[in-house]
Regions:
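Sec-dependent bacterial lipoprotein signal peptides
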Residues: 1-18
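Bacterial lipoprotein signal-peptidase II cleavage site
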Residues: 20-32
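Contiguous segments within soluble domain cores/interaction surfaces
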Residues: 29-158, 162-214
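Thiol-/selenol-based redox modules, centered on thioredoxin-like
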Residues: 188, 193, 208, 212, ...
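Short active-site neighborhood of thiol/selenol oxidoreductases, capturing the structured segment around
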Residues: 213-218, 224, 232-252
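Active-site-proximal beta-strand/loop segments in catalytic clefts of secreted hydrolases
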Residues: 245-248, 279-282, 320-322
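Typically the conserved alpha-helix immediately C-terminal to a functionally engaged Cys/Sec
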Residues: 253-270
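Thioredoxin-like thiol-disulfide oxidoreductase module
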Residues: 271, 277-303, 308-315, 325, ...
């Protein structure tokens, strides 16, 4: 396999995943909605349940040595930009040379440098983005969309600095490896609200504040007025809240539409226990005008972001970039 590069040159197809930026039962993990074309559904179902034992142990090898034992070829597109020392969710897509998403049992290995001892494997289950039909927008992940799921691994970075990653996906009887790199900072250097901290009491856009002009505060097609009934400032600290920052129509990736649809599906199940709020990203829905005030108050520089906040007003989970049905639901449960 090629030498692990210090910076991954990301192809356009990868940007479709990274541009914006778990487990357990839910109202359906979505695999039944994944298209069956070309055996995709079967691949995603297998990819949803990897185990560490499905992958080679590191046995004291460096990350480069692990990579050299596998076949190269695909690229990895990270779905986030924010990583801190300690526990992190690493979300990503794996894309082949034709720009198609690769689905199979997947895991992640990490190390501070390619020549350092590898850590892992950390299983990365595929999390389905395809909602039930009743919750799909025009921007949705659908039964005809081959972008059906996103991978997510729980990893721990022990120190700040650059870290090299190696994603490994089972395909065609072999192992396909794809390298990347992330920058990790101390929590004190991350000014985005973290788990355990009080969420900023921001005024989010509502149907009332928009004087009934739903399209001015929601680029989803059709709009989702259910997610714009209450301002975050009016409910935070009184009951659990799921606050989603996303722009379905203007997102630089293909994930803002699906995550907003997932919010609607979660509201249908948990709306009696939690308030679900969607906040658009850009002033006047124009990227040239900059970010809306709530995003500035949360110190966000990418999107989508999900913040789940408990009844005490403190963040119980935060998710950046792409997240599917299981991950969203598990986040919701942290505040219930």
């Amino acid at each position: 396999m090629r030498r692990l590069p210090p910076i991954l040159a990301v192809i356009a197809a990868v940007l479709a995943v990274a541009g914006c930026g778990g487990g357990g039962k839910d109202s359906g993990d979505g695999t039944a909605n994944v298209p069956d074309k070309g055996g995709l559904r079967t691949k995603v179902q297998a990819a949803a349940a990897p185990k560490a034992s499905d992958f080679p142990s590191v046995d004291g090898r460096s990350l480069q040595e692990v990579a050299d034992s596998m076949q190269g070829g695909p690229e990895v597109g990270l779905a986030g930009q924010t990583y801190i020392t300690g526990d992190n969710r690493l979300a990503f897509g794996v894309i082949d040379s034709q720009g198609k998403f690769v689905y199979g049992k997947t895991a992640v290995y990490i190390a501070p440098t390619p020549d350092a001892p590898a850590q892992g494997p950390f299983p990365a289950p595929a999390d389905v983005l395809v909602t039930d039909p009743a919750f799909r927008s025009r921007q949705a992940a659908s039964e005809t969309d081959l972008f059906a799921a996103v991978y997510g691994a729980d990893v721990k970075f022990s120190k700040p600095g650059n870290w090299t990653l190696l994603t490994v996906t089972q395909s065609g009887g072999g192992m396909l490896a794809a390298p990347s790199q992330v920058k990790v900072v101390k929590p004190s250097k991350d000014d985005i609200p973290q788990v355990g901290e009080a969420a900023p009491r921001v005024e989010t856009d509502t149907i009332a504040s928009a004087k009934g002009d739903e399209e001015s505060i929601d680029t989803r097609i059709p709009t989702a007025p259910e997610l714009h009934q209450e301002s975050f400032a009016d409910v935070v600290g009184k009951k659990p809240v799921a606050l989603l920052f996303a722009t379905p129509q203007l997102c630089q990736s293909r994930v803002c539409g699906p995550v907003t649809d997932i919010a609607l599906q979660m509201k249908a199940k948990y709306g009696d226990k939690m308030t679900f709020i969607h906040q658009e990203v850009y002033e006047d829905n124009d990227p040239n005008k900059g970010l809306r005030k709530p995003l500035q108050q949360f110190n966000l520089k990418s999107e989508p972001w999900l913040f789940v906040v408990g009844a005490d007003g403190k963040v119980t989970e935060r998710l950046e970039g792409s997240f599917g049905l299981k991950t969203f639901e598990n986040a919701v449960k942290t505040a219930l």
